[in-house]
Amino acid sequence: MLKEFSTRIIASVCTVMFLFALLMPLSESWGYNVITAGCSSSGGGSIILRTSTILRTEGTNGPDLMLGCNTPDTMYGKSGSDVLQGRSGDDMLYGDSGDDSLQGGEGGDELHAGTGNDIIFAGVDDDFLVAGKGDDELYGEEGNDLLEGGDGADYFDCGDGLDVIVDYDPSKGDTHTNNCEDIRERL
């Protein structure tokens, strides 16, 4: 049942993104637990808005969609196939286990995917990408990025800027494309 609200809401970008949750339970919308830095929601659709700055946000053991704000965010996806978006600010994103997608956005970000077959997008500015275990894809995009694949057959796309791959190993199936500034093979 939909309720009408006559209250004027003034909110940050993070809060506005979740006003749709008043219309349908989040568990029915995408099958993800939706969590933002500074605002969180459970699978049943309740919304908790916090007025203080949140520096650390943790996901659940299921699939999570975690959205950062325009400030430096630290997010931990935990287990499950998670989507973590840092957006603006110098963010630290940790996917942990599962097939995760990490997106840095603007700012100098540090992105750690963990185990699983992950996809990591650096975004804008100078970023550090660490894939970990699994067959991963690392995209340097803009900025001068440092890309570390780890175990598994990894794909590196250096993108714009002067990107460096620090552990390239073609014997385990690593491949690369685009203009990499430097490719250092694992010894």
Predicted segments with their positions:
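Bacterial N-terminal signal peptides
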Residues: 12-24
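Sec-dependent signal peptide cleavage junction
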Residues: 23-36
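Glycine-centered beta-turn/loop sites at beta-strand termini
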Residues: 41-44, 49-51, 58-59, 68, ...
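Extracellular beta-strand-rich, repetitive "passenger/adhesive" scaffolds
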Residues: 145, 162-163, 168-171
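N-terminal secretory signal peptides that target proteins for export/translocation
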Residues: 1-7
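Long, distal/terminal scaffolding or interaction modules
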Residues: 35-38, 83
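Short, low-complexity, Pro/Ser/Thr/Gly-rich segments in the mature regions of secreted, periplasmic
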Residues: 177-187
